[in-house]
Amino acid sequence: MVLMLAFLAMGLPTMAQKSNKAKPETLVKKVQGIWKKAKKQVSETGKELGEKIGVDDLKKQRTEDDGLIEVEGMRYMPVYHYDQFMNKDTAAGQEMVKLARAAFAKKYPRAQILYSVVPQEDWTSTIVCNGETVTGYRRRAYAYVVAKDGNDGYLNARFLFREDKQPGQDYVKSSAWPLLERTDAIPNQVYPKLIQ
Protein backbone atom coordinates (compact mmCIF):
# COMPACT_ATOMS: atom_id res chain seq x y z
CA MET A 1 0.00 0.00 0.00
CA VAL A 2 2.81 2.34 0.85
CA LEU A 3 4.39 1.41 -2.42
CA MET A 4 1.18 2.30 -4.28
CA LEU A 5 1.00 5.64 -2.54
CA ALA A 6 4.60 6.33 -3.48
CA PHE A 7 3.88 5.59 -7.16
CA LEU A 8 0.76 7.71 -6.99
CA ALA A 9 2.69 10.60 -5.43
CA MET A 10 5.32 10.41 -8.15
CA GLY A 11 2.70 10.25 -10.92
CA LEU A 12 0.65 13.25 -9.77
CA PRO A 13 3.15 15.92 -10.87
CA THR A 14 3.53 14.19 -14.25
CA MET A 15 -0.24 14.04 -14.77
CA ALA A 16 -0.58 17.70 -13.82
CA GLN A 17 2.05 18.66 -16.39
CA LYS A 18 0.33 16.66 -19.13
CA SER A 19 -3.06 18.26 -18.57
CA ASN A 20 -1.57 21.77 -18.84
CA LYS A 21 0.35 21.06 -22.03
CA ALA A 22 -2.24 19.11 -24.01
CA LYS A 23 -5.42 21.15 -23.76
CA PRO A 24 -8.00 19.83 -26.17
CA GLU A 25 -9.19 22.26 -28.86
CA THR A 26 -12.53 23.76 -27.91
CA LEU A 27 -15.61 23.23 -30.02
CA VAL A 28 -15.74 26.95 -30.83
CA LYS A 29 -12.19 26.93 -32.21
CA LYS A 30 -12.90 23.82 -34.28
CA VAL A 31 -16.00 25.42 -35.78
CA GLN A 32 -14.09 28.66 -36.47
CA GLY A 33 -11.38 26.71 -38.28
CA ILE A 34 -13.91 24.83 -40.39
CA TRP A 35 -15.75 28.07 -41.16
CA LYS A 36 -12.55 29.85 -42.30
CA LYS A 37 -11.61 26.97 -44.60
CA ALA A 38 -15.12 26.77 -46.07
CA LYS A 39 -15.27 30.54 -46.59
CA LYS A 40 -11.93 30.53 -48.41
CA GLN A 41 -12.98 27.63 -50.66
CA VAL A 42 -16.34 29.25 -51.48
CA SER A 43 -14.60 32.53 -52.28
CA GLU A 44 -12.12 30.83 -54.62
CA THR A 45 -14.88 28.80 -56.28
CA GLY A 46 -16.99 31.92 -56.67
CA LYS A 47 -14.15 33.77 -58.40
CA GLU A 48 -13.56 30.87 -60.79
CA LEU A 49 -17.26 30.51 -61.53
CA GLY A 50 -17.60 34.26 -62.02
CA GLU A 51 -14.83 34.23 -64.61
CA LYS A 52 -16.41 31.28 -66.42
CA ILE A 53 -19.91 32.77 -66.64
CA GLY A 54 -18.80 36.35 -67.12
CA VAL A 55 -19.68 38.16 -63.90
CA ASP A 56 -17.37 40.94 -64.99
CA ASP A 57 -19.73 41.32 -67.96
CA LEU A 58 -22.44 42.28 -65.50
CA LYS A 59 -20.11 44.86 -63.96
CA LYS A 60 -19.26 46.08 -67.44
CA GLN A 61 -22.96 46.32 -68.26
CA ARG A 62 -23.51 48.47 -65.17
CA THR A 63 -20.70 50.72 -66.40
CA GLU A 64 -22.28 50.85 -69.86
CA ASP A 65 -25.64 51.69 -68.29
CA ASP A 66 -24.02 54.63 -66.50
CA GLY A 67 -24.09 56.35 -69.91
CA LEU A 68 -27.88 56.30 -70.04
CA ILE A 69 -29.70 59.53 -70.81
CA GLU A 70 -32.57 60.57 -68.55
CA VAL A 71 -35.55 62.14 -70.29
CA GLU A 72 -38.85 62.83 -68.52
CA GLY A 73 -37.88 60.58 -65.60
CA MET A 74 -36.98 57.57 -67.78
CA ARG A 75 -33.46 56.34 -68.64
CA TYR A 76 -32.62 55.44 -72.23
CA MET A 77 -29.57 54.31 -74.16
CA PRO A 78 -28.18 56.90 -76.55
CA VAL A 79 -29.27 56.47 -80.18
CA TYR A 80 -26.10 56.08 -82.23
CA HIS A 81 -26.25 56.70 -85.95
CA TYR A 82 -22.57 56.74 -86.92
CA ASP A 83 -20.62 53.49 -87.39
CA GLN A 84 -16.97 53.88 -86.36
CA PHE A 85 -16.02 50.19 -86.29
CA MET A 86 -16.52 49.81 -90.07
CA ASN A 87 -13.71 52.31 -90.68
CA LYS A 88 -11.19 50.08 -88.89
CA ASP A 89 -12.35 46.47 -89.43
CA THR A 90 -14.88 46.37 -92.24
CA ALA A 91 -15.40 42.58 -92.34
CA ALA A 92 -15.96 42.22 -88.58
CA GLY A 93 -18.17 45.32 -88.49
CA GLN A 94 -20.31 44.05 -91.37
CA GLU A 95 -20.68 40.65 -89.71
CA MET A 96 -21.77 42.23 -86.41
CA VAL A 97 -24.29 44.51 -88.10
CA LYS A 98 -25.69 41.65 -90.19
CA LEU A 99 -26.06 39.30 -87.19
CA ALA A 100 -27.55 42.02 -84.97
CA ARG A 101 -30.10 42.92 -87.65
CA ALA A 102 -31.07 39.25 -88.12
CA ALA A 103 -31.48 38.68 -84.36
CA PHE A 104 -33.47 41.90 -84.04
CA ALA A 105 -35.78 41.01 -86.95
CA LYS A 106 -36.44 37.61 -85.41
CA LYS A 107 -37.28 39.12 -82.01
CA TYR A 108 -39.27 42.11 -83.33
CA PRO A 109 -40.73 41.04 -86.70
CA ARG A 110 -43.16 43.98 -87.00
CA ALA A 111 -40.56 46.70 -86.37
CA GLN A 112 -39.02 48.38 -89.41
CA ILE A 113 -35.22 48.54 -89.05
CA LEU A 114 -33.87 52.00 -89.85
CA TYR A 115 -30.15 51.39 -89.34
CA SER A 116 -27.55 49.37 -87.44
CA VAL A 117 -24.18 50.58 -86.21
CA VAL A 118 -21.16 49.63 -84.13
CA PRO A 119 -20.36 53.04 -82.59
CA GLN A 120 -16.99 52.13 -81.08
CA GLU A 121 -13.75 52.39 -83.04
CA ASP A 122 -12.25 49.07 -81.93
CA TRP A 123 -12.78 46.12 -79.62
CA THR A 124 -12.87 46.93 -75.90
CA SER A 125 -10.28 44.57 -74.39
CA THR A 126 -9.90 43.39 -70.80
CA ILE A 127 -7.56 41.01 -69.01
CA VAL A 128 -9.10 38.00 -67.24
CA CYS A 129 -7.35 37.20 -63.96
CA ASN A 130 -7.63 34.51 -61.31
CA GLY A 131 -6.19 36.13 -58.23
CA GLU A 132 -2.81 37.49 -59.31
CA THR A 133 -2.50 35.27 -62.40
CA VAL A 134 -3.55 36.29 -65.92
CA THR A 135 -5.73 33.46 -67.27
CA GLY A 136 -6.89 35.00 -70.53
CA TYR A 137 -8.18 37.95 -72.46
CA ARG A 138 -11.68 39.14 -73.34
CA ARG A 139 -12.83 41.61 -75.95
CA ARG A 140 -16.24 43.14 -76.60
CA ALA A 141 -18.03 45.14 -79.22
CA TYR A 142 -21.59 46.44 -79.22
CA ALA A 143 -23.93 46.76 -82.17
CA TYR A 144 -27.03 48.94 -81.94
CA VAL A 145 -30.15 48.44 -84.05
CA VAL A 146 -32.68 51.27 -84.32
CA ALA A 147 -36.14 50.56 -85.70
CA LYS A 148 -39.48 52.28 -86.13
CA ASP A 149 -42.17 50.69 -83.96
CA GLY A 150 -45.26 51.51 -86.01
CA ASN A 151 -46.54 55.04 -85.37
CA ASP A 152 -45.94 54.78 -81.62
CA GLY A 153 -42.19 55.29 -81.43
CA TYR A 154 -38.86 53.57 -81.89
CA LEU A 155 -36.90 50.60 -80.61
CA ASN A 156 -33.19 50.83 -79.78
CA ALA A 157 -31.49 47.47 -79.12
CA ARG A 158 -27.94 46.80 -77.92
CA PHE A 159 -26.23 43.53 -78.89
CA LEU A 160 -23.03 42.29 -77.26
CA PHE A 161 -20.36 40.49 -79.27
CA ARG A 162 -17.82 38.88 -76.95
CA GLU A 163 -14.72 36.80 -77.61
CA ASP A 164 -12.46 35.09 -75.08
CA LYS A 165 -8.88 33.96 -75.50
CA GLN A 166 -6.61 31.69 -73.48
CA PRO A 167 -2.94 32.78 -73.49
CA GLY A 168 -1.24 31.50 -76.63
CA GLN A 169 -4.55 30.59 -78.32
CA ASP A 170 -6.93 32.27 -80.77
CA TYR A 171 -10.02 34.24 -79.77
CA VAL A 172 -13.18 32.14 -79.47
CA LYS A 173 -16.65 33.65 -79.91
CA SER A 174 -19.03 33.40 -76.94
CA SER A 175 -21.90 30.93 -77.14
CA ALA A 176 -24.38 33.82 -77.46
CA TRP A 177 -23.13 35.61 -80.58
CA PRO A 178 -24.75 38.13 -80.50
CA LEU A 179 -26.35 38.53 -77.08
CA LEU A 180 -29.29 40.94 -76.88
CA GLU A 181 -28.46 42.92 -73.75
CA ARG A 182 -31.10 45.62 -73.75
CA THR A 183 -33.93 47.07 -75.81
CA ASP A 184 -35.47 50.49 -75.17
CA ALA A 185 -38.93 51.41 -76.39
CA ILE A 186 -38.66 55.13 -77.17
CA PRO A 187 -41.68 57.44 -77.57
CA ASN A 188 -41.63 59.71 -80.66
CA GLN A 189 -41.14 62.91 -78.63
CA VAL A 190 -38.12 61.46 -76.77
CA TYR A 191 -36.26 60.04 -79.79
CA PRO A 192 -34.63 63.31 -81.01
CA LYS A 193 -33.21 63.95 -77.51
CA LEU A 194 -31.29 60.65 -77.56
CA ILE A 195 -29.46 60.98 -80.89
CA GLN A 196 -25.67 60.98 -80.42
Please provide the spans of the model-predicted regions.
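Cystatin/cathelin-like cysteine-protease inhibitor module
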Residues: 18-196
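Sec/Tat signal peptide C-region and signal peptidase I cleavage site
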Residues: 10-16
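Intrinsic-disorder-linked linear interaction elements in eukaryotic regulatory proteins
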Residues: 5-9
